[in-house]
Each structure stands twice: as C-alpha cells, then as structure tokens.
Design a protein with these regions (language model features):
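N-terminal periplasmic/intermembrane-space "pro-region" immediately following the signal or transit peptide
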Residues: 13-15, 19-66, 76
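Outer-membrane beta-barrel "beta-signal"
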Residues: 347-349, 382-388, 393-395, 407-421
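Detector for outer-membrane/organellar transmembrane beta-barrel domains
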Residues: 84, 181, 221-225, 247-364
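Outer membrane beta-barrel
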Residues: 78-191, 220, 398
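Residue-level signature of outer-membrane beta-barrel architecture
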Residues: 75-81, 117-118, 129, 174-177, ...
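Residues that define the transmembrane beta-barrel architecture of outer-membrane proteins
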Residues: 65-71, 106-111, 165-169, 176, ...
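Outer-envelope beta-barrel architecture signal
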Residues: 39-51, 67, 81-89, 121-123, ...
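Transmembrane beta-barrel strands of outer-membrane/channel proteins
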Residues: 51-57, 89-95, 127-129, 184-188, ...
Length: 421
C-alpha cells in the first residue's frame, strides 16, 4: 500500500482543478446612487493584478518534512472594445522551489481568453477559452460538467478550486428574458482524444478540449424565491447526462440547496482503468444548508453522493487485490473532483472580522463514509487596503487506500502574502 503514497505526489499535483461583469455593473450602480450629485465617480478599472508569495512546510507520512517556496502573478482583464463587444483575459504564472536558493520551476496558465458580443439587450454570444462554472453546492458540484481536469491549484479549498482553474475553448450563445434564460455551449476537440479528467493529460488543451462535448441549460423563475436550472450535457461517444440545480430561502437566515446529475456512465474504477464494462444509470448529488448566524458567521452542512464510487469496504478490497489499478482510480477522482466513496460529508465555516477588524476565518472538514478518510483545512486571513496575510493549516487522516490517506503528505502549514493592484 505504500506505493499509493509514493505515487500520491502526482495525485496531489492533480488536485492543484459574464457573471463578474454583471456584478461589477450592479456595484457601480449602487455606488453612483449613494454618491452626492456633485461627487465625481471614478471609472471602473478594467484590470486586476495580484502578486502572491509564500512558504509551505509539509510533513510526510513517514515523519520526514519538506519546505517549499512559491511566487505567483495572477491577472485579469475585462476591457470593452466597443459598446457591444468586450474582451476577457485571465492568466496565472507560478514559480516554485524547494529552497530559496534552488532553481525555480515556472508554470503558466491561460485561465480565460474570450470575446463577448451582446447584439441585443437579451442576447449574448461568447467565443474563446471560457471558465464556465455551474452548481449551487459548496464542496461537490455534480452539474459542473467542465470541472474535470481543469484545476491548477494545490489548495483543497473549494472556493480556490473553482476560481483557479482552466476554462475550456467553446462557443456559447445565451438568450435571456425577465424570468429566465437558456444557453447552448459547444466545446470542440482540439487535442488527442482522451477522457476528461485523465491524469496523463500534460497540456492545457489536453486537459480541457480532448473530446467533443456540448451543454444545454435553461432556467425559469417559479414563484418568488424558486428558480431551478436544468442541464443536458453530452460527450462524444457517451450517453447524455442530465442535471438540476435548486436552492431557496428558508426563513431569513438559511439557504437550502440541492444539486443532482445523472445518466448512464461507468464506475470510477472502470473509467480510470479504461474498462467501462459496467455502464449503467448512475446519479451524483449534493444536498446542503447554509446558515448565517449573528456576528457574520456562516456555516454549511453538505451531504454528497456519487453513484460511480465504491461501497463500504470495496476500497480496501480493491487496494489489496490490485494496488496499481486502485491508485489509478484515486488519481482520477482528484482530477474529476469526485468523491471516491458512494457517500461523503462536508462542513464549511467562515467568519469575518473575528476578534479584530479585517481578520477572517475559513475552514472545512470533509469525510468519506465507509472508511476513516478525513481532511481538515483552516485559514486565518488578515485583510489590509492593498494586501492580505494568511496562515493556512491542512491535515489528512486515513489508511493508504483512502483518497486522503493516499496523498503524499499528512499535514501542511502555509504562510502567504497577497498584494492587490
């Protein structure tokens, strides 16, 4: 079983996988309304730039430890070329080293690069590398069909995983009306064919555009607080997958949400080992509630289910019978961002201005049902006007055949600084 931990380093690396404009316009409108009539209004800057630096101390399962250093540059551009056309670009460059004097390894990612055309008030057409995110859940998003193989961050934080990932090259057309919308996405194959989420994909196009696929979505307001979203997704050579997103207010402080996807598909184990002999209808879902407490504290409790995962005891049996094949399944699960077991649980807590102004706390615990696999993550972040300091702690527990026990490191401590421009 130690082979899984030895190969876990590559698995851990895999773990490292138009709405913003509307939000910005809304914020600008509110600020303008609150301003005095004679107060000048600053034009919104079309770009953002973050400079990151940090150090990480990790402890392996055998008791040895290692230190790593990282520097990163993350930029976004949202520029209006014409009244109805804008260009969106997002990119990230990282440099990592084992010591301060060692040679740095540089990696770069083009997260987004597309043109958006709005021919009318209710039509939008986008083309290029687009980072489309779907789903209402927090820890596991079954309907986020373009998530597979896209993550480029080593952080287990679900917010970071959804933000720091590769978009897929696609064309998207959207029609809007007062109470709903419908959109169609077409994403072509632009690299050698392989299944989405394959850990052996070694370049951006292989990770995101190795197969032809399309996605049709629609939403419609029902009542005052209900607006479900329906999805139909298909990859070339595979059966269509159907999805549903739903959330609603429960009282004044709680949001209840549900996310479901289903269709004919192989098990995770068969997919990872290129067998696909057990194709049948399988469901994946996430149900949860987010509650906002006084003092700006928010908690989320989420139950996760993966019909392609293994039942209780199967991970131990498969790991003992064929460690290499089971290691493949674990590697695929990280790239797919799917639980390994049939059921899992996720709890997330966040709080702002803890004890002092500008000090935020965030953390989660996730656990697989059926084994002792656990993962915990905690962050303290102090916000200033132009930068922030954060201290992160991460801990895994589990036997070598579990998805958390197979990771190469038992614990990590990170100290990070982020400069905002």
């Amino acid at each position: 079983m130690s082979a899984l931990r030895l190969t876990g380093l590559s698995i851990a690396a895999a773990l490292a996988c138009g709405h913003a404009v509307a939000a910005g316009q809304d914020d600008a409108a509110l600020a303008l309304a609150d301003a005095a009539p004679d107060a000048p209004v600053a034009a919104a800057r079309p770009w953002k730039l973050n400079v990151e630096g940090g150090a990480e101390r990790s402890e392996r399962w055998d008791g040895t430890s290692a230190t790593r250093y990282r520097a990163a540059l993350d930029g976004e551009l949202n520029y209006r070329l014409a009244p109805e056309v804008r260009a969106v670009v997002g990119a990230r460059i990282e440099r990592n080293a084992e010591t301060l004097t060692a040679e740095y390894r540089t990696r770069s990612y083009l997260k987004e690069a597309y043109l958006s055309w709005q021919p009318g008030a209710s039509q939008v057409v986008d083309a290029g590398r687009i980072n489309q995110r779907f789903g209402v859940a927090t820890g596991f998003n079954p309907t986020d069909f373009f998530r597979s193989g896209s993550v480029v961050t080593s952080s287990p934080d679900p917010v970071s995983r959804r933000t720091n990932r590769l978009g897929s090259v696609m064309v998207q057309a959207q029609q809007l009306w007062d109470s709903g919308s419908v959109s169609l996405l077409l994403s072509p194959r632009l690299a050698a064919r392989r299944e989405p989420g394959d850990p052996e994909a070694d370049d951006a196009l292989s990770k995101t555009n190795s197969i032809n696929r399309w996605l049709l979505t629609g939403s419609q307001q029902i009542g005052a607080t209900l607006r479900p979203q329906w999805l139909i997704y298909r990859e070339q050579g595979h059966s269509p997958q159907f999805g549903l997103n739903l959330n609603t207010l429960l009282g004044q402080s709680a949001i209840v949400y549900g996310e479901w996807a289903g269709g004919r598909a192989p098990s995770l184990y068969s997919l990872a080992n290129h067998q696909e002999q057990d194709v049948r209808f399988r469901s994946r879902s996430a149900l949860g509630v987010t509650y906002t407490w006084p003092l700006d504290i928010t908690t989320t409790f989420e139950w996760q289910a993966n019909g392609a995962g293994v039942a209780k005891g199967e991970d131990l049996a498969l790991g003992a019978r064929n460690p290499l094949a089971w290691g493949n399944a674990l590697g695929w699960s990280y790239n797919l961002q799917d639980p390994v077991t049939r059921q899992a649980f996720f709890t997330y807590v966040s709080a702002h201005n803890v004890l002092v102004q500008g000090l935020d706390l965030a953390g989660f615990v996730q656990a697989d049902r059926g084994n002792a696999g656990r993962q915990a993550w905690l962050e303290f972040r102090k916000r200033y006007d132009s930068f922030s300091l954060s201290l992160q702690w991460q801990r895994q527990r589990g036997e070598p055949w579990t998805r958390f026990g197979a990771l190469p490191e038992r614990s990590n401590v990170r100290l990070l600084v982020d400069l905002y421009y």
